[in-house]
């Protein structure tokens, strides 16, 4: 499902009609968030977001995993494994698991650190990570889930859209009322520029959160390889238009754009149509790393896709922070709290 357009406008008739349901959803979410979570013998750092959909959580989790590794730690990634069908909890092996089994984010995270997909059993997944050598656990999503105690929580916000109309789903994009979420967070990371993100940053500051600023930076080599080539772009992420705008900002030539819902499970027939359209126009297909990761598994293992998927270019992005030592400060805080709860 794609987010309704009215979520990103000032509250109107649609959000007003849905607000009673949003009030119930918000109350239930806050009641769940107030429950004590189970604890494991490792610091837990959670990367979540206050809204439904993507805002840059996975690149943030990757940046944190890489920083922990550079510090000499052995971090594990922990996530639900959205769309995965394999029995969970499960340690991801990219050599045998496709996105159909473990979800797209898990395959990306597993390139940087050992990764556990846990389904709804995050506490069991965290325990598995610790038993197999995790010194730290980085949760990709799960801020609103109470099952696992978090030593540090970071909320990631898209600077362009912020929290939209600031209403709780289905009246708006929020998973729960904003201020109580900020009260449970240690930091808010605003990714990208925009007045909507600035407003969230101001509220986060008033709530006592550390405010960080960051940007998703496309891989220069990948961009250079696509210059001068006609492109057809497709994406099934929280805001596909954000991906398309990135391509245009980098000076790439887009002939067409195809937007799909977040975590869209691509069917072979859909990809075949895109491939044929690209061939007919002498273009190359380009997509996000997440979307490219979903083009794995038995559905895309047939001979008709031999060599075809290699021609679909992913555009990797990395998180750049305005404060170089921000991640170290978060890790230090998590480790201090972990030591305090052990004594």
Curated annotation (Swiss-Prot):
Any GO CC annotation of this UniProt entry: plasma membrane
EC number: 2.7.1.130
Residue numbers binding ATP: 51-58
Reactions it catalyzes: a lipid A disaccharide + ATP = a lipid IVA + ADP + H(+)
GO molecular function: ATP binding; tetraacyldisaccharide 4'-kinase activity
Superkingdom of source: Bacteria
Pathway, per record: Glycolipid biosynthesis; lipid IV(A) biosynthesis; lipid IV(A) from (3R)-3-hydroxytetradecanoyl-[acyl-carrier-protein] and UDP-N-acetyl-alpha-D-glucosamine: step 6/6
Enzyme class, spelled out: transferase
Key words of the record: ATP-binding, Kinase, Lipid A biosynthesis, Lipid biosynthesis, Lipid metabolism, Nucleotide-binding, Transferase
GO biological process, one term: lipid A biosynthetic process
Function: Transfers the gamma-phosphate of ATP to the 4'-position of a tetraacyldisaccharide 1-phosphate intermediate (termed DS-1-P) to form tetraacyldisaccharide 1,4'-bis-phosphate (lipid IVA).
Record-linked NCBIfam families: lpxK
Family membership noted in the UniProt record: Belongs to the LpxK family.
Name of this chain's protein: Tetraacyldisaccharide 4'-kinase
Upper taxonomic lineage: Bacteria, Pseudomonadati, Pseudomonadota, Alphaproteobacteria, Hyphomicrobiales
